[in-house]
Structure formats: structure tokens, C-alpha cells
Swiss-Prot record:
Annotated organism of origin: Acidovorax sp. (strain JS42)
CDD domains to which the protein is assigned, alphabetical: HATPase_Hsp90-like
Keywords: ATP-binding, Chaperone, Cytoplasm, Nucleotide-binding, Stress response
Function of the protein: Molecular chaperone. Has ATPase activity.
Keyword ATP-binding: yes
Protein name: Chaperone protein HtpG
GO MF annotation, one: ATP hydrolysis activity
Gene expressing this chain: htpG
Keyword Chaperone among record annotations: yes
Length: 650
């Protein structure tokens, strides 16, 4: 039968080189990846066979076999799962089914642990075999196809691969690794069992290896050796981890299971394992990762929760079980009530699925609330009676974890304000921000309320592109002068999210960059009277400024928020900030073409200089453009701005 040579997808050869060399010291992960792939292939067969039992042929017992041949220097991982046709072998093994190939290569850092984590995230687990092999041969036959339609795929990991049709009686796939000289350890049964026990013990299918026994040499003086008996034995527990009692599962086993389903190299931040009984019965094992994946901001990415029904795998991207803002959650949900032939359409419509989703969201939020509660826990808090509280080791281990979580996933969590009305109040309590009293995002709305000045009627905040821009915004000047704390919000999602949160625990949220500032009881009568008098005296100048800036500003008015700066830009109450409008335009989306309001400080020297100046028109435009620059924007015509400034400096 003729062989056909194909070239790898562009960049794959380079990627193989990087994978091989950047992960060399973590080479045992290849076995984790290949066993996981074999298990997935069996899961897929089981799912397809729900509607076509003939796919089982004469082998209904699904399993993974691992064998080695010292003479040939090969290690083989075989499954009797769904298998591949010739075209599927070309499609699945000759290309990387991710648009992020270049991202993968760019993110390889030389840090062995971090790079190992990327392997599974980018869907390149199969290629990790080249860490230990200088050639890989794959033989496969798809379930349901005749034996004559088997396929052999082979590559040395360079620029191309060969494919040929073969006779293959057995359904499923064999991955044959031709080991490098320095991968001798993987021709040792003890080593292979150790790696399987470490990474794949939880796999619900049996993983089989040939039994070995010690045999003395028949020749005097020669050492004995381990020989294969021809019998096969199961070398893993072969039971789904989530079905076992919690008391029988160690933290290490929970962590290893997480690494297997998430392809993450790091331990999770926390997890929750529960059996829920009631109107609908299901088991959930949910994890919160310690690090954000590379594609966290891809809202179309598959959800990280696998769905099982009565321990039968159904799908691994069950987005109906977890909302988009919790797309970082990994884990397993096993339902006792859903039909085995559940479709995606049924998932979206099922009452049971809605109950499972609601329960799972509440479980995740409870995990986060628990971490947040212990984040600031004093290891030895002194009580009112002078006796130090004893902090448990479990509580001590949670300290600092919410800060770690929020640094990775806080911005995504904010999306929930607009997506999950039922849990909006719980989500609001979990949010953290920087403020004028703290550069780190550690201030909750509750913290802010507890520090509000007497007579303060609102929670004040400002949105900006960067922390520096927020901290130095002219719009904060009157708040700094009066010692009023302002929350500093610098995530792109902030302003959008806060459209869905008008108040916190009855206290309204107020942007310092929207509408007129009314400090209410925090402003004494003398200040109010002086501001009114200044506005009245400045009316003629305001009229001239409005006329000069009629194409740029919706209005010009005397400020109540500036102390040291000559001017600032604000928008009307309920309007879109100039920052959000810029972000939308940068993303190629339409934004309302609303003009901002220019507020001027009549006490500033530059503003006073306007009166009677022959350069009034130029100064007015400079005033506007500088206010725009101060909030992170750019003048509409930078060249004209520079020309005006130069003319005044000359």
C-alpha cells in the first residue's frame, strides 16, 4: 500500500522543536498526556455508542494498555476507543487545532513548570511524545470501519509525516514511541507504573500492563532478570475520583486529578467536592486554578467543566453548566438524572440542567467567599478579653489566596454583574479595587463604606486606562483636599460592569467624572456660596469659551471639583465616559459620538489669562486638549495642538 508524505501545518515543525527542548527536564508528562488522550478516545466511543451499539464490535470492555519492548526500544500506548480514519489522522496529527500556535511559541519562557502547563492548554499534548522519542508511529482504525481501512501515521518530528493505509483488525489507536538513547528509564516497568500512579491513577478506565516476574538465569554466574508472563494486570485504581468518599481522597490525589483534566502543571488554588441530593441528584468536583490560562479573555473558549451522566462521559465543554464569567472554573459534574443521550439543545432547555448550573455557581461563589473571608485573617488576632484567637492550619493555608485569585481572575468576575442578576449582590461583595488610600486592589465596597466620612452619601469612583492616570486625574482634586476616598478602577470591563450596579447595600455609586459634583453635607455653606458667586462672575467668559469650543464641547461650566488644575473633562450623568468610548472604538465597535463637558477653574492663572488675551481662541483649544491629555486621551488634531503651543512659547 502506497505511502503519502504530507507537510506539517506551518509553524508545527518549529513548535515541535520548542516543545522537545523547552520541556526536557519534565519529560515524564508525555505519558500523562498520551494516557489522557487514550482515555478521551474511549469516552468518545462510549458516547457515540449510545446511539449505535454496533461500534463496540466484539470488544465492549474499554481499556488502555501500556507496553514496552527493550529490544526494539519502543513504548506503546494502546486504546480500544473511537480510533481514527485516514483523513482524521491527517487532520488531527498533522495540524494543531488552535489558532494560537504562534502564541504558544511566544509564551514558551524557558521556565520548565510554566511551559509544561502550556502543553495541554494549547492542545499539543500528543506532540509531547517527541520529548522522549525521535520517531512516533500511530496505527489506528476508526470504530465502524472495516479492517482494511486502518491507517499508519509516522513522523520524526521534522517538517513532514507519512500516512499509509493498513490492515488493522483491532478498533482503536496505538501510539508507538521509538525512544531516544537518553529515555532508557521508560523501558522499565517500575518507572512506567510510578508515572501512571502519579498522573493517571484516577482515570476511570483500567490501565493495563504486562505482569513481570523475576527469573534466575539458567547460566551459572549470569544475573537473573524480570521477564514478562504474558498476563495483564491493572496498574491504576480505575475508579472515577469524584465517586469516591471525600475521606478516602488525599489532597495530592485531588491535585493530580485537577492537573489531568486541566492540563495545568500547578496545583489548584482551591476545590470543592460535593454530592447534591434533592429534586435533582448530581456530584460536583469543581476547581479554581491558581493561574489564568492564556485565552482567558476569549469569551468563545470552551467551558472547563466536563459533564458525565451516571459516570458516562458526555461532553467536555458543557457551557450550559457554568456561566461565561466563571469560564476559568475546571472540574466535573456527574448527573444521576439527565438522559444518557442528552444533546446540547436539551442542555440549554432542561430544568435539571438549570438547577445544576444554579447550584454549581453558588458553590463556586461560596468557595470564593470562603477565601475572601480568610484573606485578611490575623494569624493571632487579639480578642476583647486579651486572649489570642487560635488560627487553624486550614484557615492559615487560605491566607492570601483570595488576593492571588483576584489578581488572575478579578476582571473576569466583574462580567458577572451584567450576566448574573440573581447573584449580583454576592458578586459585588467579592470585588476589590485600588483607591486613593491603597495602590493594590484590596479595597472592597464594604471596606469603603466602613471608612466613609460622616455626611458622605455616595461611594465615589473613577475609571481610567492606568492606575497612574486614575491617581493623578484632576477630577480627584477636591476629594483629595477633603480627604474623601475614591475607588480607582482601571480594568477595561469596569465601566461596563458598573452600569449594572447602581448601589451597594443601599449606598449609590457615583463616578467623579460624570455630572456635577455635589458633595452635599461635606461642603459647607461658605464654599457653596463662593462657588455660586464665581460662576455668576464668570458667565461672560463661559459664553466665549462655549462659542470657541462649540465643535468639541457640549458645554463649558465652572468646576466644583478642581483645586490645582485649570480644566477637566466630564460627561453628563448616565453618559458614556470618554475612556470607554475610546476603548470601544479601538475594538472596532461603534460608540456614541457625544461631546464631553469642559469644566474650568476660574482661580487658575491660565484661565485668568484668557480674559482679554489676543490668543483667546488658541488658549481655549489648548485648555481643552490638555484636559483630554490629562485623562489619557489624544487631541483630535495633534499637529494643530503642537502648533498652538509652539506659537505661544515663541
Amino acid at each position: 500500500m502506497s505511502k503519502h508524505t504530507h507537510s506539517f501545518q506551518a509553524e508545527v515543525a518549529q513548535l515541535l522543536h520548542l516543545v522537545t527542548h523547552s520541556l526536557y527536564s519534565n519529560k515524564e508528562i508525555f505519558l500523562r498526556e498520551l494516557v489522557s488522550n487514550a482515555s478521551d478516545a474511549c469516552d468518545k466511543l462510549r458516547f457515540e455508542a449510545l446511539n449505535n451499539a454496533a461500534l463496540y464490535e466484539d470488544a465492549p470492555n474499554l481499556e488502555v494498555r501500556v507496553s514496552f519492548d527493550k529490544e526494539a526500544r519502543t513504548l506503546t500506548i494502546t486504546d480500544n476507543g473511537i480510533g481514527m480514519s485516514e483523513q482524521e489522522a491527517i487532520d488531527h496529527l498533522g495540524t494543531i487545532a488552535k489558532s494560537g500556535t504562534r502564541d504558544f511559541m511566544n509564551r514558551l519562557s524557558g521556565d520548565q513548570k510554566a511551559d509544561a502547563q502550556l502543553i495541554g492548554q494549547f492542545g499539543v499534548g500528543f506532540y509531547s511524545g517527541f520529548i522522549v522519542a525521535d520517531r512516533i508511529t500511530v496505527e489506528s482504525r476508526r470504530a465502524g470501519l472495516p479492517a482494511s481501512e486502518g491507517v499508519r501515521w509516522a513522523s520524526g518530528g521534522a517538517g513532514d509525516f507519512e500516512v499509509e493505509a493498513i490492515e488493522r483488525a483491532a478498533r482503536g489507536t496505538s501510539v508507538i514511541l521509538h525512544l531516544r538513547e537518553d529515555a532508557e528509564e521508560f523501558l522499565n516497568a517500575w518507572k512506567i507504573k510510578q508515572v501512571i500512579g502519579k498522573y493517571s491513577d484516577h482515570i476511570s478506565l483500567p490501565i493495563l500492563m504486562e505482569k513481570e516476574e523475576w527469573k534466575e538465569s539458567e547460566k551459572e554466574g549470569e544475573p537473573g532478570q524480570m521477564v514478562k508472563t504474558g498476563e495483564w494486570e491493572t496498574v491504576n485504581k480505575a475508579s472515577a475520583l469524584w465517586t469516591r468518599p471525600k475521606k478516602d481522597i488525599t489532597d495530592e490525589q485531588y491535585q493530580d486529578f485537577y492537573k489531568s483534566i486541566s492540563h495545568d502543571f500547578e496545583n489548584p488554588l482551591t476545590w470543592s467536592h460535593n454530592r447534591v441530593e434533592g429534586n435533582t441528584e448530581y456530584t460536583q468536583l469543581l476547581y479554581i486554578p491558581a493561574k489564568a490560562p492564556f485565552d482567558l479573555w476569549n469569551r468563545d473558549k470552551k467551558a472547563g467543566v466536563k459533564l458525565y451522566v451516571k459516570r458516562v462521559f458526555i461532553m467536555d465543554d458543557a457551557e450550559s453548566l457554568m456561566p461565561s464569567y466563571l469560564r476559568f472554573v475546571k472540574g466535573v459534574i456527574d448527573s444521576a438524572d439527565l438522559p444518557l443521550n442528552v444533546s446540547r439543545e436539551l442542555l440549554q432547555e432542561s430544568r435539571d440542567v438549570r438547577l445544576i448550573r444554579d447550584g454549581s455557581v453558588k458553590r463556586v461563589l461560596s468557595m470564593l467567599e470562603d477565601l475572601a473571608k480568610h484573606d485578611k485573617h490575623e494569624a493571632a488576632a487579639e480578642g476583647a478579653d486579651g486572649v489570642q484567637d487560635v488560627v487553624s492550619a486550614e484557615d492559615k493555608a487560605k491566607e492570601g489566596k483570595y488576593t492571588q485569585f483576584y489578581a488572575e481572575f478579578g476582571a473576569v468576575l466583574k462580567e458577572g454583574l451584567g450576566e448574573d442578576f440573581a447573584n449580583r449582590e454576592r458578586l459585588a461583595k467579592l470585588l476589590r479595587f485600588a483607591s486613593t488610600t491603597s495602590d493594590t486592589p484590596s479595597v472592597s465596597f464594604a471596606d469603603y463604606k466602613a471608612r466613609m466620612k460622616e455626611g458622605q452619601e455616595a461611594i465615589y469612583y473613577i475609571t481610567a486606562d492606568t492606575l497612574a492616570a486614575a491617581k493623578n486625574s484632576p477630577q480627584l482634586e477636591v476629594f483629595k483636599k477633603k480627604g474623601i476616598e475614591v475607588l480607582l478602577m482601571t480594568d477595561r470591563v469596569d465601566e461596563w460592569a458598573l452600569n449594572y450596579l447602581q448601589d451597594f447595600d443601599g449606598t449609590p455609586l457615583q463616578s467623579v467624572a460624570k455630572g456635577a459634583v455635589d458633595l452635599g453635607k461635606l461642603q459647607d455653606e461658605a464654599e457653596k456660596k463662593a462657588a455660586e458667586e464665581a460662576a455668576e462672575a464668570f458667565k461672560p467668559m463661559l459664553a466665549k469659551l462655549k462659542e470657541a469650543l462649540k465643535d468639541k464641547a457640549e458645554d463649558v461650566r465652572v468646576t466644583t471639583r478642581l483645586v490645582d488644575s485649570p480644566a477637566c473633562l466630564v460627561v453628563q450623568d448616565g453618559g458614556m465616559s470618554t475612556q470607554l468610548a475610546r476603548l470601544l472604538k479601538q475594538a472596532g465597535q461603534s460608540a456614541p459620538d457625544a461631546k464631553p463637558v469642559l469644566e474650568v477653574n476660574p482661580e487658575h492663572a491660565l484661565v485668568k489669562k484668557l480674559d482679554g488675551s489676543v490668543h483667546f481662541h488658541d488658549l481655549a483649544h489648548i485648555l481643552f486638549d490638555q484636559a483630554l491629555l490629562a485623562e489619557g486621551g489624544l487631541p483630535e488634531d495633534p499637529a494643530a495642538y503642537v502648533k498652538r503651543v509652539n506659537a505661544l512659547l515663541a
